Curated annotation (Swiss-Prot):
PANTHER family, per the entry: MANNAN POLYMERASE II (PTHR43083), MANNAN POLYMERASE II COMPLEX ANP1 SUBUNIT (PTHR43083:SF2)
GO biological process, one term: protein N-linked glycosylation
Name of the gene: ANP1
Protein's UniProt name: Mannan polymerase II complex ANP1 subunit
Region (Disordered): 424-500
Lineage: Eukaryota, Fungi, Dikarya, Ascomycota, Saccharomycotina
Its biological purpose: Involved in the organization of the secretory pathway. Required to maintain a functional Golgi apparatus. The M-Pol II complex possesses alpha-1,6-mannosyltransferase activity and is probably involved in the elongation of the mannan backbone of N-linked glycans on cell wall and periplasmic proteins.
Membrane topology: Single-pass type II membrane protein
């Protein structure tokens, strides 16, 4: 066998290109391995290739959802994120009209909002009022104002605690009440959450003032769980405003020590002297001039207004209906979500306003104020009546006096040498303060003269009486004389009537 010995020759240009390609290839592999991503995944991430989706069109009764598409976007209103709007209701007929007024003015696309109501343990016409308001909302001519899917559930949980402010917020009722409310929330959330929901929003029905952009305002923070600050208005005599929701807080050393000292089934509730936790509360962090975008990390949260990504509930977080780390319901939901490495955030300067509900003491004070108002009105009415009587019975002569004063006071001007004659007597008695010679007599001299005249008259009367009694000299009379003179015309008898 013969071999042809040929000398191999390489084109320098070819070698240069090959070297460049090899260098690029190895560098690319090095970069991709550093970021633990394959070339195929990189191309897919850039949108050139779409993930594999099986085709179930020809398979009846099969629905396919890729849950990667429902993670919750911070601009969900632009991405078409659907929101599950959960509302627990109990004896809420008087609050539903206000609630639907807020609902109808929300700026989040209504067709992306699915409403889910749970009516439980109600004794009023909550269901009837709910149906009538839903009919009005869904019959609007502007179809963009109509909401998406609407579900109504009815289930009682044996709630026997009253709905008054004092009943619901009494210390002794807090533990059992929170656990029952947690059961209701879990029941509603478990049956209402659908695979296509990206967000879940919990709202109390008795919120009085809330921004129409509440969904967008909370959503754009892109947090797993987020709540606003909640305050309430008060009457003037109670201070105008007050923090309402104290269930949103950050853990403190005092809270941990208190939890360690309590029984396993105990439930810590905020705002009561029995449980002093010294925790920083979201409500008290509010600054009226603060930035509404400011965030505060929380451990426990309140349930008035909660926006959470649907994945939080899908992965197992819920509202514990038992004592979880000595808390229950929404506060325990916050702690549980933190344990699952979800971020829980509050907005201290972004405020919504709960309605004012008077306590038993407030109602007593309001009754006293009503009675006091009646008393003041009656007192004012009587005062006006007596003022009218005074005006009628007593003539105001001040204007007349101002007119006559000058003409009266001119008589005391000594330069005029006026001889003044003043009649100090009562009108018509005929006496004057001028003597028989026409000279002026002072009131004191006149009084002395009158006394002398009276004494003279008395003496004359005594003399006349003495003359009539037969004693012109004024000699004192004994008893016999008095008896004799008592009957001067007595005639003596000629016989003695005592003799027989």
């Amino acid at each position: 066998m013969k071999y042809n010995n040929r000398k191999l020759s390489f084109n320098p240009t070819t070698v240069s290109i090959a070297g460049t390609l090899l260098t690029v290839f190895f560098l690319t592999r090095l970069v991709l391995s550093f970021f633990s991503i394959s070339l195929f995944q990189l191309v897919t991430f850039q949108g050139i290739f779409k993930p594999y989706v099986p085709d179930f069109k020809n398979t009846p009764s099969v629905e396919f959802y890729d849950l990667r598409n429902y993670q919750g976007n911070k601009d969900g209103w632009q991405q078409g994120d659907r929101i599950l709007f959960c509302v627990p209701l109990r004896d809420a007929s008087e609050h539903l009209p206000m609630f639907f007024n807020h609902l109808n003015t929300m700026t989040y696309p209504h067709n992306l909002i699915d409403l889910s109501f749970l009516v439980s343990d109600s004794s009023d016409n909550t269901m009837g009022v709910l149906l009538s308001n839903l009919q009005m909302a869904q019959s609007q001519q502007d179809k963009s104002k109509r909401f998406g899917n609407i579900e109504i559930y009815e289930k009682d949980f044996g709630q026997i605690i009253g709905q008054s402010f004092s009943d619901r917020h009494g210390f002794g009722a807090q533990g059992p009440r929170r656990k029952l409310m947690a059961r209701a929330r879990n029941w509603l959330g478990s049956v209402a959450l659908k695979p296509y929901h990206s967000w879940v929003y919990w709202r109390d029905v008795d919120v009085e003032t809330i921004p129409t952009t509440i969904m967008e305002d909370l959503m754009h923070h892109d947090k797993d769980v987020i709540v606003p600050n909640v305050w309430r208005p008060l009457p003037d005599w109670l201070g105008n405003i007050q923090p309402y929701d104290l269930n949103s807080w950050k853990e403190s050393e005092g809270g941990l020590q208190l939890a360690d000292s309590l029984d396993e089934d105990a439930v810590i509730v905020e705002g009561y002297p029995e449980y002093a936790t010294w925790r920083p509360h979201l409500a008290y962090m509010r600054d009226p001039n603060g930035n509404p975008e400011d965030e505060m990390e929380l451990d426990g949260i309140g349930g008035v207004s909660i926006l959470a990504k649907a994945k939080v509930f899908r992965t197992g977080s819920h509202f514990p209906a038992f004592s979880f780390e000595k808390h229950a319901e929404t506060e325990a939901f916050g702690r549980l979500s933190r344990r699952m490495n979800y971020n829980v955030i509050g907005l201290p300067h972004y405020v919504i306003w709960h309605i004012y509900e008077p306590s038993s003491d407030d109602l007593k004070h309001m009754a006293w104020m009503a009675e006091e108002e009646k008393r003041k009105l009656e007192e004012e009415r009587i005062r006006e009546f007596y003022n009218k009587i005074w005006e009628i019975g007593f003539e105001d002569v001040r204007d007349q006096w101002n007119e006559e004063r000058d003409s009266i006071l001119k008589n005391i001007d000594s330069t005029l040498n006026n001889k003044v004659t003043v009649d100090w007597s009562e009108e018509g008695d005929g006496s004057e303060l001028v003597d028989s010679k026409g000279d002026f007599v002072s009131p004191n001299n006149q009084q002395q003269q009158q006394q002398q005249q009276q004494q003279q008259q008395q003496q004359q009367q005594q003399q006349q009486q003495q003359q009539l009694d037969g004693n012109p000299q004024g000699k004192p009379l004994d008893d016999n004389d008095k008896n004799k003179k008592k009957h001067p015309k007595e005639v003596p008898l000629d016989f003695d009537p005592d003799r027989n």
